[in-house]
């Protein structure tokens, strides 16, 4: 079991190596719009999970995630070799590529928060000129409340 700090440093280094290799060495056009977002390394330093996102060519175009996954799978050997050459460790970790769903989840949460804000504004508009039903102070009070303690006890 390796030190957690060492595993974190190695994971960050693997992320950098994989991203640079995809950008400069891998000759697959399907990987042009792939971004490496994170890497996690197991405690024994033998397996690395590389998280990635895929953008569309335009803002309106849906990204081709299946083609990117296939291209990463095909380039896995070249990427692992680059990691082994540049990392300088005895055992080069195996690379597993996983689509990062954080951007989609984040966008969905932003959408839900915007809907909640809109509903809150509607409630605030409806409550703007309203008066409370009943008394201004709806809580029951005892007849002794508000008087000094010596008078309240009857002494």
Swiss-Prot record:
Record Pfam families: RBFA (PF02033)
Organism annotation: Corynebacterium kroppenstedtii (strain DSM 44385 / JCM 11950 / CIP 105744 / CCUG 35717)
Entry's Gene Ontology cellular component terms: cytosol
Keyword check for Transport: no
Annotated localization: Cytoplasm
Residue ranges of the region described as Disordered: 116-155
PANTHER family noted in UniProt: RIBOSOME-BINDING FACTOR A, CHLOROPLASTIC-RELATED
The keyword Cytoplasm belongs to this UniProt entry's keyword annotation: yes
Subunit structure: Monomer. Binds 30S ribosomal subunits, but not 50S ribosomal subunits or 70S ribosomes.
A molecular function (GO) term: ribosomal small subunit binding
UniProt protein name: Ribosome-binding factor A
Location, primary (coarse class): cytoplasm
Family as reported in the entry's similarity comment: Belongs to the RbfA family.
UniProt keyword annotations, A-Z: Cytoplasm, Ribosome biogenesis
Listed Basic and acidic residues bias regions: 116-125, 142-155
Superkingdom, taxonomy of origin: Bacteria
